[in-house]
Regions:
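Conserved nucleotide-sensing/catalytic segment adjacent to the nucleotide-binding pocket
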Residues: 1-4
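Conserved catalytic-core segment of NTP-binding enzymes
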Residues: 7-106
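NTP-binding/hydrolysis catalytic cores, primarily Walker-type P-loop NTPases
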Residues: 108-169
């Protein structure tokens, strides 16, 4: 997993191409999945065109992350289609907005969302997080996982040999 800040995805993909990573993906030597986390700005959307040349042999997911009340150009079909329909085979994932207070408390607790929802601390010890905030987090996680299921995310990241091994176990 590689996590790059906004604006560096094209540069990172260029470097991966130059070191042979993309060629290895093309030969099925590794699984290449790109999660392109989009902001609601045109600059964020412009990067879609820039990276399309690098994602031909990848499972490519355009992720609309609703960290606030933005609309991602849903109000303007022409703008929306000019970006989101540009890349053949791209899947769109929508991460819904999480209640701000719940999100803040998860960050303050320094635990994964799943741990917060399960009322577990950083070392899996029992915690005393707010019942209501845990409820918001669990509900939000359910929506996120439903999105992953909708786009069949596991089919993109689990290779056929891994599926065979899992079936035999």
């Amino acid at each position: 997993m590689i996590d790059v800040r906004a604006g560096l995805l094209s540069t990172t993909l260029r470097a991966l191409r130059d070191v042979g990573f993309l060629e290895a993906a093309k030969k099925n030597e590794l699984t290449f999945v790109v999660f392109h986390i989009l902001g609601p700005s045109v600059a964020s959307l412009d990067e879609i065109a820039d990276i399309s040349a690098f994602t031909a042999d990848a499972s490519y997911f355009l992720v609309k992350n609703f960290i606030n009340n933005t609309t991602f150009f849903d109000w303007d079909p022409a703008t929306y289609n000019s970006y989101f329909k540009k890349i053949k085979g791209a899947h769109e994932i929508t991460v819904p907005k999480l209640n701000e207070m719940a999100c803040e408390q998860v960050e303050l607790a320094s635990v994964p969302y799943v741990s917060f929802g399960a009322n577990k601390g950083p070392n899996s010890e029992a915690a005393s997080y707010s019942f209501v905030l845990r409820g918001y987090v669990k509900h939000w996680l359910g929506k996120v996982w439903a999105e992953f299921d909708r786009v069949k995310l596991l089919d993109s990241v689990v290779t056929e040999p891994q599926r065979k091994t899992a079936r035999q176990a």
